[in-house]
From Swiss-Prot:
Belongs to the LuxS family. It comes from the Bacteria. It is an enzyme of class 4 (lyase). Its EC number is 4.4.1.21. Keywords: Autoinducer synthesis, Iron, Lyase, Metal-binding, Quorum sensing. This is S-ribosylhomocysteine lyase. InterPro entries: LuxS_sf, Metalloenz_LuxS/M16, S-ribosylhomocysteinase. The keyword Lyase applies. It catalyses: S-(5-deoxy-D-ribos-5-yl)-L-homocysteine = (S)-4,5-dihydroxypentane-2,3-dione + L-homocysteine. Binds 1 Fe cation per subunit.
Amino acid sequence: MPLLDSFTVDHTRMEAPAVRVAKTMNTPHGDAITVFDLRFCVPNKEVMPERGIHTLEHLFAGFMRNHLNGNGVEIIDISPMGCRTGFYMSLIGTPDEQRVADAWKAAMEDVLKVQDQNQIPELNVYQCGTYQMHSLQEAQGIARNILERDVRINSNEELALPKEKLQELHI
């Protein structure tokens, strides 16, 4: 099985909250696609609560588009990681990490402005697979945590697992 890019970085040295370019590629037509690791929690030490991350998924995608789309950037998708320590964001374009970090912080400010659970987009049986599994309070707690700790940049070069370690892990 091919080794995914996300498993070539040392999760024990990852900082959070932090932005990292997880992957860059070009389409056959030459469009640049960038995938960002938006790490909300320190791996293996913190985890986002399931209701909070689900609510954040509904809010975050729209708020990030408001703050990041434009000037050669268009978000394709923002999805939570299965480990519940962050989100992956795929987009057209190549914004630098600081631009992404600034948009992320602005989106977290927007999450704090949501006053009622009824303002969560697509919160209904028709548009959400588990529409009863939400918590605005938990999502706002996550947002506050990000803003209090600020957003840093994780460098692939600093986090790269040495080839010897990958061999030792039988990868």
